[in-house]
Amino acid sequence: MARVKGGVVSRKRRKRVLKLAKGYYGAKHILFRTAKEQVMNSYYYAYRDRRQKKRDFRKLWITRINAAARMNGLSYSQLMHGLKLAEIEVNRKMLADLAVNDAAAFTALADAAKAKLGK
């Protein structure tokens, strides 16, 4: 039986890793070993940051809502509590969008929250 050296398979594996490392800085897109390490790290960062992105956007929305709420004489927590008492269910993403793009609608919601809080 003939000896199989596996050159084709090895080259394909290395080529696949180097293709994934395209655009990386320095040796990380040229040398197989460093490229492989960087690709593995990249997968880790991608997995981690897909979850982090959700947290980051929620923080951004809360910051925007808080800024708009303070313009209407309420804190973020007072606004959210007032909206809950008024039985107005608007998620933070939509509230932040209203705060940025439709100040009049946000003010109407803030006034409804104030009324329920007794302010």
From Swiss-Prot:
<dbReference type="GO" id="GO:0000027">
    <property type="term" value="P:ribosomal large subunit assembly"/>
</dbReference>
<dbReference type="GO" id="GO:0006412">
    <property type="term" value="P:translation"/>
</dbReference>
<dbReference type="InterPro" id="IPR005813">
    <property type="entry name" value="Ribosomal_bL20"/>
</dbReference>
<dbReference type="Pfam" id="PF00453">
    <property type="entry name" value="Ribosomal_L20"/>
</dbReference>
<dbReference type="GO" id="GO:0003735">
    <property type="term" value="F:structural constituent of ribosome"/>
</dbReference>
<protein>
    <recommendedName>
        <fullName>Large ribosomal subunit protein bL20</fullName>
    </recommendedName>
</protein>
<dbReference type="GO" id="GO:0019843">
    <property type="term" value="F:rRNA binding"/>
</dbReference>
<keyword id="KW-0687">Ribonucleoprotein</keyword>
<dbReference type="InterPro" id="IPR049946">
    <property type="entry name" value="RIBOSOMAL_L20_CS"/>
</dbReference>
<dbReference type="InterPro" id="IPR035566">
    <property type="entry name" value="Ribosomal_protein_bL20_C"/>
</dbReference>
<dbReference type="GO" id="GO:0005840">
    <property type="term" value="C:ribosome"/>
</dbReference>
<dbReference type="GO" id="GO:1990904">
    <property type="term" value="C:ribonucleoprotein complex"/>
</dbReference>
<keyword id="KW-0689">Ribosomal protein</keyword>
<comment type="function">
    <text>Binds directly to 23S ribosomal RNA and is necessary for the in vitro assembly process of the 50S ribosomal subunit. It is not involved in the protein synthesizing functions of that subunit.</text>
</comment>
<comment type="similarity">
    <text>Belongs to the bacterial ribosomal protein bL20 family.</text>
</comment>
<keyword id="KW-0699">rRNA-binding</keyword>
<keyword id="KW-0694">RNA-binding</keyword>
